[in-house]
Curated annotation (Swiss-Prot):
It is found in: Plastid, Chloroplast. Signal peptide: none annotated. PANTHER family: ATP-DEPENDENT CLP PROTEASE, CHAPERONE PROTEIN CLPC1, CHLOROPLASTIC-LIKE. Residues 505-540 form the UVR domain. GO terms for molecular function: ATP binding; ATP hydrolysis activity. This is Chaperone protein ClpC1, chloroplastic. It comes from Oryza sativa subsp. japonica (Rice). It comes from the Eukaryota. Widely expressed. The lineage of its organism: Eukaryota, Viridiplantae, Streptophyta, Embryophyta, Tracheophyta.
Length: 918
C-alpha cells in the first residue's frame, strides 16, 4: 500500500520535471535513496494503518528509476536493483512517457500488469518519437491497436492496484532495448530502442497485435534503423553481431548529404551558374581559408549552386582536388534545438568538427551562414562563429556559406575576423533569357509533379511577366513560383468531376438524405428501394470517373497532350498576385475601352480634351504599347475651381478600376511644410513613425495598378517636386527603408489652380474681346498663357517629365444646366430610398441654374443652390408631415420666385420628369 501511494504521487512529478531539471532530480533521488520508510505507530493502536502519502511526503522521495526498478527487480532480489536503476537513468523523456502511458493503458483495461501489448500502446500513444512516427507510417493507429488488444486479452476485473508490476516478457523487452541501444552506439534509451526491443522479443501479445494489423516486423525494424541513421546491415547481425558504431553520427544527425541526394536524383537540375560553381571549386582547392561564401539577393539561386556542386561531384565532373568529396548541409536550427544546459551546444559543435577533421572528404554547406553569429551564445559562453574560426582559418574545415547581401553586411562584415575567413562569391540575379533556360531545365520535374505539360510560351511568359510586374522579388525564384502555381491551378481545374458525374453526385446526396429519413421513420421498404438507387448511382459515378481516367491515360500513352499550362494561365496568376490586368483584352473590355469617353461624359460635362487624354492613356497601357519603364501616364490638370478636375479622376477610378476608393488621393495642402514631406516615403530612422512606412509608397506597394491623385499640387512644398522627378521619369521611388516601390502601373494626375486668373479673364488682351464663336482660338490662347504661368511656378525639369498639361475650360451655362440634372438625380435617388417620388418643374430647374451659375467658381455654387432651394424646403415639409413616405412631391417656383413643394396633385403645371444623366 505504502509503495503504491508513493508511486502514484511521485512518478508523474519526476516525469514533469525531468525535461527541465534532470540533474536536480537525479541528485535528489541519490540523496534520498538511503532514507528509511516509517510506519505510523500510535500508543495503544499499533498497526492501525500504514503510512499514506500525506504522512510520508517529507520522508519518501523516489525517482522514476527506483519505482520501475522495484517492479522489475522484485522477483530477483535486491542485488540487481543498482544495475536496473542505472538503466532507467538512461531513459529519455519520451521513453519515460512511453512507460507511463503503458501503465495508464493497463489501468484503462483493468489489468494488474504491464505487458508487451501495453508497451506497444504506449509507443503509439506517445506520438512524437521515432517509434511512433514509424508505426504511424505503417498505418498503425492507437484506436485500431486498442481494439486488437481487447480482442486478444479482453478487459480486467476493474480493480487495479496503483503499483502495477511488469510481466517477465515486458522486463525482457526493457533489457533487450538496452542491448539495442548499445549496439547502435547510443548512451541513452529512447522510444526507438524500446520498439526494437519489442521486435527482438518476437513473441507475446504485442507481436500478435502487429501481425493482426498487417505490419511486418522486419519492415518496421528497417524503418526504425533508417530513421536513427544506422544501416540495416550494421545491426542485422543481431545479438552476436557486435557493436559497430556510426562513423559520423553527429554529422548524420544534424546534416543532410547533398551528394547522396544528387546520386539518387532527388535534387532539381542546376542550369547555368558555371562561373560561380567554378569560382567555388577554385576556393575549395586553396590550402588555407578555403571557405567560399555565396552572397546574393533572396531567390537568385545560392543554395542551387551548392546543389550544382554536389551534382558535379556525383557525376565526377570536378577536378581531383575535390573528387569523391561529400557536400553535407548543416541544419543550424537542429544543432541548437534541445540544448538546455550550458555546454551542450559547444559539445555538439566540437564533436561535429572532430568528425569533419577525421574525414577529409567532407565539405560543409551552411545555408544562412549569418546564423552562426550568436548561435548558442549565453552568458559567459562563446557562439558558434568563434568556435569555428580557428578551424576555418587553418583549412581544417571546408565550409561553403550562403547569405543575403543585407545579412552579410549586418552580421559578417561587423566581425572582420570572421569575414576574412570567408571568400565572397557574388551571385547576381539571372537575366530573363537565363531564367527561361532555367525554367526549361526544371520543366520536366514540375510536369511530373503536376501531371501535365507546360508550353514554351508559358515558360517565356513566366520569365517576362514576373520581371515586368513583380518588382519586389528576384528571378528565377518568382518565375519558378509562377509556373508552379499555374500548374497547380490547371491540375485542380482538370481534377473536378465531369458535368454528368456532378449531376449524379447531387442526386446521390439527395437519395442518401431521403434514405436516412425513411430509416428514421421506420419505412424500411422505401429505405430499401432508396438504398438500391444509391448503389446504382455510386456505380454510375464510378464508371464515369474511370472512363475519364482511361481517356486521359490513353491520350498520354498515344502521345497526345494532356492538361496544358498556357500563357493565359501564367497571366491569370500574375493578375491574381498583383492586381494588374495582364491577360489579353476580351471583347467586352475592348468595347468598354473604345466607349470610354462616352461613359466618362455621363459624369464629366464638357472638358473634352481632358477626357480624351485620359482615355488614350488607358487604352495605350491596356494593349501593352506604353513605355514599360514609365508610369501609364502623368498629367497636370490646370484650370479654375469647380470645373471637374478632381471629379474626372474619381470618375476614372469608379469606371475602370472598380470604385472611387480604388484611387490613391493625396491632398497636397497637408505637405506645405518641409518636415511633412517625409510622410510621403516614411519617417527617417530615429523618428516617430519609422516602422509605419510612407503614405504614398505603402499605398502603391499594396495597389500597384491604380490612379494616384495629387490634389492642389501647387500648395505642396517645393521638395515634393524633387521627390517626384524619379517617379515621373523612371516609375520608381525608394522609401525610407530602402525598398524600391514600382510606379510603372499607376496613372498620375496632378490638379492645380495655377492660371485660373488668366482663364477667368478669358485670355483677353487690353482693348480686345473675343466672341464666344471663336472659342477654339480663345482656348488655345488661354492654354498658352496658362502654360507660361505653370513654367513660372514649376521647375522646367518637373514640367518636362509630364506627358501632358491639360487646361480645363470654364463651364458655360448650358453645361451647368446638364450638371444640375446630374445633381438633381442624386437627390431623387436619395429620396427614392425613403420611398418618396420627387419631380421638379422646368421653372425650378432654370431658377437653380440662374442662382448656381458663376463662371469663376464652376459647378460648386450649383451644389449650394440645390441645397438651399430644394433640400432645405423639402426637409421642412417632411418634418411638418406634409411629405411622408409613399408620397410623390413636385417642386415648383411661384410667380414671386418662391420655391413651393406640392404633394403630387392637380392645379400645378406639367412637371418635368426626373432629371436623367446625359
Amino acid at each position: 500500500m505504502e509503495g503504491s501511494l508513493v508511486q502514484s504521487a511521485i512518478a508523474p512529478t519526476i516525469y514533469r520535471r525531468s525535461g527541465t531539471a534532470r540533474f536536480r532530480v537525479r541528485a535528489r533521488a541519490t540523496m534520498m535513496r538511503t532514507m528509511p520508510t516509517r510506519t505510523l505507530t500510535l500508543g495503544g493502536f499499533q498497526g492501525l494503518r500504514q503510512t499514506n502519502f500525506l504522512d510520508s511526503r517529507s520522508v519518501i522521495k523516489r525517482d522514476f528509476g527506483s519505482i520501475v526498478a522495484s517492479q522489475i527487480s522484485r522477483p530477483r532480489g535486491l542485488g540487481s536493483r543498482g544495475v536496473v536503476r542505472a538503466m532507467f537513468e538512461r531513459f529519455t523523456e519520451k521513453a519515460i512517457k512511453v512507460i507511463m502511458l503503458a501503465q495508464e493503458e493497463a489501468r484503462r483495461l483493468g489489468h494488474n500488469f504491464v505487458g508487451t501489448e501495453q508497451i506497444l500502446l504506449g509507443l503509439i500513444g506517445e506520438g512524437t518519437g521515432i517509434a511512433a512516427k514509424v508505426l504511424k507510417s505503417m498505418g498503425i493507429n492507437l484506436k485500431d491497436a486498442r481494439v486488437e488488444v481487447e480482442k486478444i486479452i479482453g478487459r480486467g476485473s476493474g480493480f487495479v492496484a496503483v503499483e502495477i508490476p511488469f510481466t517477465p516478457r515486458a522486463k525482457r523487452v526493457l533489457e533487450l532495448s538496452l542491448e539495442e541501444a548499445r549496439q547502435l552506439g547510443h548512451n541513452y534509451i529512447g522510444s526507438e530502442h524500446l520498439l526494437l526491443g519489442l521486435l527482438r522479443e518476437g513473441e507475446g501479445v504485442a507481436a500478435r497485435v502487429l501481425e493482426s494489423l498487417g505490419a511486418d516486423p522486419n519492415n518496421i525494424r528497417t524503418q526504425v534503423i533508417r530513421m536513427v541513421g544506422e544501416s540495416t546491415e550494421a545491426v542485422g547481425a543481431g545479438v552476436g553481431g557486435g557493436s559497430s558504431g556510426q562513423k559520423m553520427p553527429t554529422l548524420e544527425e544534424y546534416g543532410t548529404n547533398l551528394t547522396k541526394l544528387a546520386e539518387e536524383g532527388k535534387l532539381d537540375p542546376v542550369v547555368g551558374r558555371q562561373d560561380q560553381i567554378e569560382r567555388v571549386t577554385q576556393i575549395l582547392g586553396r590550402r588555407t581559408k578555403n571557405n567560399p561564401c555565396l552572397i546574393g539577393e533572396p531567390g537568385v539561386g545560392k543554395t542551387a549552386i551548392a546543389e550544382g556542386l554536389a551534382q558535379r561531384i556525383s557525376n565526377g565532373d570536378v577536378p581531383e582536388t575535390i573528387e569523391g568529396k561529400k557536400v553535407i548541409t548543416l541544419d543550424m536550427g537542429l544543432l541548437v534545438a534541445g540544448t538546455k544546459y550550458r555546454g551542450e551546444f559547444e559539445e555538439r559543435l566540437k564533436k561535429l568538427m572532430e568528425e569533419i577533421k577525421q574525414n577529409d572528404d567532407i565539405i560543409l554547406f551552411i545555408d544562412e551562414v549569418h546564423t552562426l553569429i550568436g548561435a548558442g551564445a549565453a552568458e559567459g559562453a562563446i557562439d558558434a562563429a568563434n568556435i569555428l574560426k580557428p578551424a576555418l582559418a587553418r583549412g581544417e574545415l571546408q565550409c561553403i556559406g550562403a547569405t543575403t547581401l543585407d545579412e552579410y553586411r549586418k552580421h559578417i562584415e561587423k566581425d572582420p575576423a570572421l569575414e576574412r575567413r570567408f571568400q565572397p562569391v557574388k551571385v547576381p540575379e539571372p537575366t530573363v533569357d537565363e531564367t527561361i533556360q532555367i525554367l526549361r531545365g526544371l520543366r520536366e520535374r514540375y510536369e511530373l509533379h503536376h501531371k501535365l505539360r507546360y508550353t514554351d510560351d508559358s515558360l517565356i511568359a513566366a520569365a517576362q511577366l514576373s520581371y515586368q510586374y513583380i518588382s519586389d522579388r528576384f528571378l528565377p525564384d518568382k518565375a519558378i513560383d509562377l509556373i508552379d502555381e499555374a500548374g497547380s491551378r490547371v491540375r485542380l481545374r482538370h481534377a473536378q468531376l465531369p458535368d454528368e458525374a456532378k449531376e449524379l453526385d447531387k442526386e446521390l446526396r439527395q437519395v442518401t438524405k431521403d434514405k436516412n429519413e425513411a430509416v428514421r421513420g421506420q419505412d424500411f421498404e422505401k429505405a430499401g428501394e432508396l438504398r438500391d438507387r444509391e448503389m446504382e448511382l455510386k456505380a454510375q459515378i464510378t464508371a464515369i470517373i474511370d472512363k475519364s481516367k482511361e481517356m486521359v491515360k490513353a491520350e498520354t500513352e498515344s502521345g497526345e497532350v494532356g492538361p496544358l499550362v498556357t500563357e493565359a494561365d501564367i497571366q491569370h496568376i500574375v493578375s491574381s498576385w498583383t492586381g494588374i490586368p495582364v491577360e489579353k483584352v476580351s471583347s467586352d473590355e475592348s468595347d468598354r475601352l473604345l466607349k470610354m469617353e462616352e461613359t466618362l461624359h455621363t459624369r464629366i460635362i464638357g472638358q473634352d480634351e481632358a477626357v480624351k487624354a485620359i482615355s488614350r492613356a488607358i487604352r495605350r497601357a491596356r494593349v501593352g504599347l506604353k513605355n514599360p519603364n514609365r508610369p501609364i501616364a502623368s498629367f497636370i490638370f490646370s484650370g479654375p475651381t469647380g470645373v471637374g478636375k478632381s471629379e474626372l479622376a474619381k470618375a476614372l477610378a469608379a469606371y475602370y478600376f472598380g470604385s472611387e476608393e480604388a484611387m490613391i488621393r493625396l491632398d497636397m495642402s497637408e505637405f506645405m511644410e518641409r518636415h511633412t514631406v517625409s510622410k510621403l516615403i516614411g519617417s527617417p530612422p530615429g523618428y516617430v513613425g519609422y516602422t509605419e512606412g510612407g503614405q504614398l509608397t505603402e499605398a502603391v506597394r499594396r495597389r500597384p495598378y491604380t490612379v494616384v491623385l495629387f490634389d492642389e499640387i501647387e500648395k505642396a512644398h517645393p521638395d515634393v517636386f524633387n521627390m517626384m522627378l524619379q517617379i515621373l521619369e523612371d516609375g520608381r521611388l525608394t522609401d525610407s527603408k530602402g525598398r524600391t516601390v514600382d510606379f510603372k502601373n499607376t496613372l498620375l494626375i496632378m490638379t492645380s489652380n495655377v492660371g485660373s486668373s488668366v482663364i477667368e479673364k478669358g485670355g483677353r488682351k487690353i482693348g480686345f474681346d473675343l466672341d464666344y464663336d471663336e472659342k477654339d482660338t480663345s482656348y488655345n490662347r488661354i492654354k498658352s498663357l496658362v502654360t507660361e504661368e505653370l513654367k513660372q511656378y514649376f521647375r522646367p525639369e518637373f514640367l518636362n517629365r509630364l506627358d501632358e498639361m491639360i487646361v480645363f475650360r470654364q463651364l458655360t451655362k448650358l453645361e451647368v444646366k446638364e450638371i444640375a440634372d446630374i445633381m438633381l438625380k442624386e437627390v431623387f435617388d436619395r429620396l427614392k430610398a425613403k420611398d418618396i417620388d420627387l419631380q421638379v418643374t422646368e421653372k425650378f430647374r432654370d431658377r437653380v441654374v440662374d442662382e448656381g451659375y458663376n463662371p469663376s467658381y464652376g459647378a460648386r455654387p450649383l451644389r449650394r443652390a440645390i441645397m438651399r432651394l430644394l433640400e432645405d424646403s423639402l426637409a421642412e415639409k417632411m418634418l411638418a408631415g406634409e411629405v411622408k413616405e409613399g408620397d410623390s412631391a413636385i417642386v415648383d417656383v411661384d410667380s414671386e420666385g418662391k420655391v413651393i413643394v406640392l404633394n403630387g396633385g392637380s392645379g400645378v403645371p406639367e412637371p418635368l420628369a426626373p432629371a436623367l444623366s446625359v
